[in-house]
Swiss-Prot record:
Keywords: Calcium, Disulfide bond, Glycoprotein, Heme, Hydrogen peroxide, Iron, Metal-binding, Oxidoreductase, Peroxidase, Secreted, Signal. This is Peroxidase 52. Pfam families: peroxidase. Glycans are attached at N213. PANTHER family: PEROXIDASE 52, PEROXIDASE 72-RELATED. The lineage of its organism: Eukaryota, Viridiplantae, Streptophyta, Embryophyta, Tracheophyta. Substrate binds at P167. Disulfide bonds join C39-C119, C72-C77, C125-C320, C204-C229. Belongs to the peroxidase family. Classical plant (class III) peroxidase subfamily. Residues 1-20 form the signal peptide. It is an enzyme of class 1 (oxidoreductase).
Length: 324
C-alpha cells in the first residue's frame, strides 16, 4: 500500500510539472551557447547591426529594448510583437501600448535578413530580439550579460493580451507590482527594469496628465515639459520628451536620481519614489550604480525566461513580420 501511495504521489508531481506552470522546465532548455555550432557568427552579426543603428540614432537602442519588454509581457518572449496583422488575427503592434510608439522593427528585420543568409532557418526572431535588446543596452554604455537563447517563434499574436498585460504609463505602484508579479518578476525586478527609462523618450499623451495635474513633480521640470506638451488633448500628442532629463542617451542610474528630485516623466515612474515600499530600492540604485547594473542584468535574464517556446513548439520564421 505504501509503495502504491508513493507511486501515485510521483505521478501527481510529474503531471503537475508537465501541465502546470512549467517555466522552470522550459528555462533549462535555453542556453547561452545554443547556436555556437549552428550559427557561430550570430552574436557578432547582431552586435554590428545594433551598433550601427544606435550610432545613427541613439533612441533606437531604447526602442529595441522596449520591443523586447513588450514582447515578453504578452504570452512570453516569443517574437509575437514582430508579427504584422493578417486576415486571420489582429496582432500586437496596434494595441494601445504599441500604437504609434513601437519602433525598431526595421532593425530586427535587417538583422534577420543577414542571419538568414548565413544560417537559413536556424535562428528565431524571438532570439534575435533578445540579443539585440542586450546589445542596445551595451551600445549606450550599459552593462553586458550573457543572453540565453533557444527560443522559437510564435505563430500568432494577441492584441487583447497586449492591451491587458503591458503596464500603462498611468499605473499605480500596486498595479505595477501586480503586473510584474503576474509574469514571475519581483518588485525589485520591476524597479530595476523600470531603470530602462534612463534611455529613450515618451510621447506627450503619456505624461500630459502628470505635468498639469500632479503635485509630486518638480515645478521647473513641469514647466519645461509643458512648453512642448500643450494641455489640450489632441494638440501635440506625439511630441517627445526624454524619460531621463539629464542623460537621455546614456544607460546609467540618473533615472533614479531624477525620481528622488520629483523629475520622473511618467506617473508610473514617479510612483516608484513617492513614500511607498519601493523608495528604498530607488534610493539604493541612486547611490550605487553597480547595484542597479547587477539587478538590471539579473532581471533581464529572468524576463527572458518568461514562457519561451522551445523544442517543437512554434517555428523558426523566415521573415519576422509573418509566419512561414
Amino acid at each position: 500500500m505504501a509503495s502504491n501511495k508513493l507511486i501515485s504521489i510521483l505521478v501527481l508531481v510529474v503531471t503537475l510539472l508537465l501541465q502546470g506552470d512549467n517555466n522552470y522546465v522550459v528555462e533549462a532548455q535555453l542556453t547561452t551557447n545554443f547556436y555556437s555550432t549552428s550559427c557561430p557568427n550570430l552574436l557578432s552579426t547582431v552586435q554590428t547591426a545594433v551598433k550601427s543603428a544606435v550610432n545613427s540614432e541613439a533612441r533606437m537602442g531604447a526602442s529595441i529594448l522596449r520591443l523586447f519588454f513588450h514582447d515578453c509581457f504578452v504570452n512570453g518572449c516569443d517574437g509575437s510583437i514582430l508579427l504584422d496583422d493578417t486576415s486571420s488575427f489582429t496582432g500586437e503592434q496596434n494595441a494601445a501600448p504599441n500604437r504609434n510608439s513601437a519602433r525598431g522593427f526595421n532593425v530586427i528585420d535587417n538583422i534577420k535578413s543577414a542571419v538568414e543568409k548565413a544560417c537559413p532557418g536556424v535562428v528565431s526572431c524571438a532570439d534575435i530580439l533578445a540579443i539585440a535588446a542586450r546589445d542596445s543596452v551595451v551600445a549606450l554604455g550599459g552593462p553586458n550579460w550573457n543572453v540565453k537563447v533557444g527560443r522559437r517563434d510564435a505563430r500568432t499574436a494577441s492584441q487583447a493580451a497586449a492591451n491587458s498585460n503591458i503596464p500603462a504609463p498611468t499605473s499605480s505602484l500596486s498595479q505595477l507590482i501586480s503586473s510584474f508579479s503576474a509574469v514571475g518578476l519581483s518588485t525589485r525586478d520591476m524597479v530595476a527594469l523600470s531603470g530602462a527609462h534612463t534611455i529613450g523618450q515618451s510621447r506627450c499623451t503619456n505624461f500630459r496628465a502628470r505635468i498639469y495635474n500632479e503635485t509630486n513633480i518638480n515645478a521647473a521640470f513641469a514647466t519645461t515639459r509643458q512648453r512642448t506638451c500643450p494641455r489640450a488633448s489632441g494638440s501635440g500628442d506625439g511630441n517627445l520628451a526624454p524619460l531621463d532629463v539629464t542623460t537621455a542617451a546614456s544607460f546609467d542610474n540618473n533615472y533614479f536620481k531624477n525620481l528622488m528630485t520629483q523629475r520622473g516623466l511618467l506617473h508610473s515612474d514617479q510612483v516608484l519614489f513617492n513614500g511607498g515600499s519601493t523608495d528604498s530600492i530607488v534610493r539604493g540604485y541612486s547611490n550605487n550604480p553597480s547595484s542597479f547594473n547587477s539587478d538590471f542584468t539579473a532581471a533581464m535574464i529572468k524576463m527572458g525566461d518568461i514562457s519561451p517556446l522551445t523544442g517543437s513548439s512554434g517555428e523558426i520564421r523566415k521573415v519576422c513580420g509573418r509566419t512561414n
